[in-house]
Each structure stands twice: as C-alpha cells, then as structure tokens.
Amino acid sequence: MCEVDGCRSVPALFRRRVADLGEKVALREKDFGIWNEYSWADYGQRARWAGLGLKALGMERGDVCSIASEVNKEWLFADLGVICAGGVTNGVYPTDAPEQVEYLVNDSGTRFYFAEDEEQLDKLLAVRERTPTLEKIVIFDMKGLRHLDDPMCLSFDDLLERGRKYAAEHPGAWDEEIDRAQPGDLMVLTYTSGTTGPPKGSMITQSNMLFMMNVLQRCYGVFESDEQLGFLPLAHVAGRMFYTFLALESGSVVNLTESPETMEQDLREVAPSVHFAVPRVWEKQHSSVQIKLKEATALGRWAYSVAIRVGERRAEFLKARAHVPGWLEAAFAAADRLVLRNIRRGLGIDSCRWLSTAAAPIAPELIDWYWALGKPMYEVYGQTECSGIATANLADDFRIGSVGKATPGAEVRLSDQDEILIRSPGVIQGYWNKPEKTAETIRGDWLHTGDVGRIDAEGFVYVVDRMKDIIITAGGKNITPSEIENQLKFSAYITDAVVVGDRRPYLTCLVMIDAENVTQFAQDNGVPFTNYTSLCHTREVQDLIASEIESVNAKFARVETIKKFRLIDQLLDPEDEELTPTQKLKRKVVNEKYADLIDSMYRGG
C-alpha cells in the first residue's frame, strides 16, 4: 500500500500539509510584475471552499470536473478542491480548439467546467449545445464578463462564497469527504496529447500518484526549502506531477509564471533550486546562448570557448565519478567566475541543484553542454500511462544518452520486438471508456509503451524511437528518425524537424525554423523579407538551413543522411493541429498535411 507520511490518500496528505505548514509560503504568483505569496493555510482554505462550493452545486463523488486554463493559482485551488471533495479533475489545454473541448467534455462526461477567462469560455459556449453532461461553468477571470447573464455560468469568487457558506452550514463536511477517500479512487483524468488518433483519458488513482510522489522523492530529494518555477501546462502529467503533487509531498514552494511569454524572465527572477523542463525549453536556452555568441566580440567568443572546454574536461571526470584534479578545479573556478556563472544566471539556472528533462527525445550533446556549464542534467523516462516516470538517471548512478534505470518499485523489460514494457504501482487503471484500447496497452500488468528500446548489461534503458516511427527505406534499411531529428534540433536555427523516408529511396525532412533566431540572422545579413513565409523562401535562409543539415549529415552513415529538405513556411503555435501542447510536431498530421511538399522532394528521384 502506497503512503506518504502515513497518509493513504492525496486529500489526507493535503490536510496534513495545511495543518503542519500553516503560514509557510506554498505558492507565489506573478501578477503585473509583482510576486504575490499564498500560504499553505490560504491554499487549504481556498481549495476547501472550491470543493465545498461544488458540493453546494450538486457535485457527487466520482464526478468529472474539467479545467481549461494557463498555469495559475486558481487551477491549483480548483484541482485539490475537486480531489478532496471526491471529484475527478481533467485538465484541458488552453490552446485546444472548440471541437477538441467538445470531445474532451463529452468523452469524460464533464459536469463542471472551469474556464480561465472570456476566451476559454467562448470556446465552450460555442459547443455547449452538444455537451449534454455539462451543468455549470466556473470562470476564474471575469474581465470583460461583468455583465454576463447566463444561468450556467458563475465566477470563481462566487463558487468560493458558496463553499464558505456550505462550510458554515456543514462544519464537518470537508473532513468527512477527505476521510472517505480510498487508495483505489479515481482522482485524475489526463488525456494524452498524442501524435496520432483522438486523445485517450488515462485514469490515475490516489495510489498511483502517491507511489509517484515517493518515487520522485527517493530519486531526487525535494524539500520545504526548495523553489520550483511553475510554467508547464497543468493538463500535462509532468506539470501536475511537479507543481501539484511533488510540491504537496515535499512542501516546496511553486512560483507560478505570469504568462508563457514571461517564462524566461520569471526563471531568472525566481532562480529555482530544482528545475524540470521538456527538451524544447533546454534547446531554446542553448540556442539563445549560441546566437548571443555570434553577436559577441572576438574576445568574448574566445573566452567562452576556453571556459566551455574547461567545463567539458571537468565534466568528464564528474560523469566518470572520478576525482577532479586540483589544477582542473582551479581552472574551472576561474572559468566559472569569468564566464560560466554569468551564462547560468542569464538562463536562470545558477541556483539549481539539478536539472531534469523528459517528455521527448533530447540530444546527448545538449545534456553534455549543461554539465559543462556546471549544472548536472538527468534524463528520465515515463508516460502518462505510468503516472509519471518509470526510469531515471540519478546523481550517483547515471549514463548520458540513456534514460536511466528502473525507478524504485518499477520493473522494465523488453518484449520480443524490443518494445519497452513497464510494470509498477504507477501504471494506470486504464483508459476512460476505452476497454479495447486498455486491453491493447496493458497486458498481464505490463504497460506496452509503444517505444523501441534496449537495456544494457548494467540495467540502463535506452529509448530508440516510437515503434510506429521507425523508417524502413526502399532498400530495406531500418532508420531511427528521432536520432537524426535530435541532432537537427541542436541547431540554433531549427525548432523541430520531421524526417521522412519510409519505403522511399532516400531520406528527406520537413524543417520548422526558429523564427526568432532566423529573423535575427536575416536582419544581421541584410536579407529582405516581409513576413514569416517570405523569410522561409529567401535563398539565404535556404542556404543557412542546408548548411545546418550538412553539418548533421556528417555525423551519420550515408544511408542515414538527409538528401533534400523543405521548410514549413507557416508559423505554427500549439493551437495548430500540427503541434502537440508540448510543442512537438505530430508526425502523422505533418505527413498528411504536407504530403504534396514531401512528394515534391522525390519527383525525378
């Protein structure tokens, strides 16, 4: 039975944290440039009123409540309010289109829906006639909606007031609901963003997440004194795992960004002590440094070159768990004082004990770069279907390029087809309303991940690629596209790429350029353009990307090299169907939508 501090449910643990930590800071939220603090007592009171407000509106145990919002305190108050009152929370990405919202509400059977603001409300209202289970909509930010007159809608403040009154009339109701929580209760629905097919709702129980809290604590150690930056979407399992549940386990402080656009500045201001991010964030940081170097003086570039080489040499000893010679430590101290520390401060990671990455493939060279800067980065691996992570690189047991060994309590093995299989108390109950998909994915207690991998003699797991993404060329050669794509994304000028070549005579790729860095390149080199599309079609940008691809080709065998490429000349954001909410290109959608562009690279052979 999974427990945290003697608590067998998340509601019981939340009640304990509120009682024990009281006036200590639990959350900070940036609003108009000011960081406002909220104590554990504040957190507990608002979650209590939110949960009891829903009870006053008729919510029953097991009812699904969906939340569509950017990362903010109301998301967290509503989340734990729903869970403690016996409901089930389901995160909706604020970038989802009305049709996606309709699907999620109907598939989950949502009765109560939290909308961040007018924009999120409008998306739901556009489809509400086709969402028969929906009963009430709660709005966090009423800006522009003060004159809204709709019996289905109420403000979050109104919900809290209803909860306050309900608490006064039923003084024992909150504790009664918390005491009713059982380890096997469904607590969270997390819909996989997925690169193919409609999203599937992973059913995460109380015990699933308690197990994951224990795993994260045993792997990394997070404490009350630690600071996190909350910026990842809470509809994603990683955001929930760190900002709701790991914070609850550890008592650490979560600092919520003002908006996605202010994330980089907020990171510098908060200077967190522990920091998890997806590869795209790390790639963007690396790219920003590379671009600044191009604009630096010759002396500045020389100083960086010397400093990073010293950092790389020192990192070799650290990664080998070997003693660093005194002369090298002295050289690193000088390099750190003059160059590397300033880079870390500029990125906002100088105070971090460790950095962690997951949710997509990452180039090992990028991890090496952070080690050279003086910050260890550890790659972990898991899926929504195992409630978080199943393998991890640890401070005293890691191998760069791998995703680490099985975490405590988890088992990892390979099938006859080299598919990675996971068995652990974190594996979900199944997919909501999809027994056939559940039976396909979870067989004999083993989660079939859909990832091809290998496991070395010491137990380190290596993820090769998604099984469905392996390319078999017309010549019969098996190609791992993600390995090539990771190297392409290491370029400061490439945000993402999709390698194509299944049953084709050679490999090609579609490239999504880094708009900011390529625009800077064009301005620095006097390249005329009028918009993003025209920028992509300039000869200079085409040559720039061709040069980047040639550099990557030099690292691979001839059959694995990119022969032709095309640029995706539309500026994409997470609201576009080509991108997942974590900013990964959806391979299937890209292949279908840009079929003519792909075919053009094979005409004439």
Stretches with model-predicted labels:
Residues E37-A41, D157, D179-R180, M187-M213:
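Conserved AMP-binding A3 loop
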Residues G6, A26-L80, A97-E102, M152-L160, ...:
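Conserved AMP-binding/adenylate-forming core of the ANL superfamily
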Residues G22-V25, I139, C153-L154, E161-Y191, ...:
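Conserved pre-ATP/AMP-binding loop-to-beta segment of ANL
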Residues D96-A126, M212-L229, P260-V274, G346:
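Conserved ATP-dependent adenylate/AMP-binding module captured primarily in the ANL superfamily
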Residues L210-E227, L234-L340, S351:
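Conserved AMP-binding/adenylation subdomain of ANL enzymes
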Residues D496-V499, I549-G605:
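Conserved C-terminal "lid"/linker of ANL adenylate-forming enzymes
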Residues C84-R162, L544, E550:
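Structural core segment of the AMP-binding/adenylate-forming
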Residues A406-T473, F490:
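Conserved ATP-binding/catalytic segment of the ANL
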